[in-house]
């Protein structure tokens, strides 16, 4: 399943998101959700322990001035990669 987090993790039921993640799921951080990718925050630590891959939309990282501040565990992607993820996963959950 593809999960997309478009809101700040501070304004989301992040614990519920973590409970619903399964091995093999993927999470895309976009819009204000990219703040979860900033190195050193508590949400990033939770994502590191999850059995998933985590991506962040590069355009949103740039728009928020976060390039250079995100963890190496997060994979920056562009819109083409976003489309590939949506094609890959038949089910999606938006947060």
Swiss-Prot record:
> Which regions form coiled coils?
none
Cellular component GO terms held in the UniProt record = sulfurtransferase complex
SUPFAM superfamilies hit by this protein: DsrEFH-like
Query: Which InterPro entries has this protein been placed in?
Result: DsrEFH-like, Sulphur_relay_TusB, Sulphur_relay_TusB/DsrH
Q: Which Gene3D superfamilies match?
A: DsrEFH-like
> Which UniProt key words apply to this protein?
Cytoplasm, tRNA processing
Name any Gene Ontology BP term.
tRNA wobble position uridine thiolation
- The answer to whether UniProt assigns keyword DNA damage to this entry is no
Which compartments does it reside in?
Cytoplasm
What does this protein's UniProt record list under function?
Part of a sulfur-relay system required for 2-thiolation of 5-methylaminomethyl-2-thiouridine (mnm(5)s(2)U) at tRNA wobble positions.
Q: State the family named in the UniProt similarity comment for this chain.
A: Belongs to the DsrH/TusB family.
Q: How does it assemble?
A: Heterohexamer, formed by a dimer of trimers. The hexameric TusBCD complex contains 2 copies each of TusB, TusC and TusD. The TusBCD complex interacts with TusE.
User: What protein is this chain from?
Assistant: Protein TusB
Gene for this protein? tusB
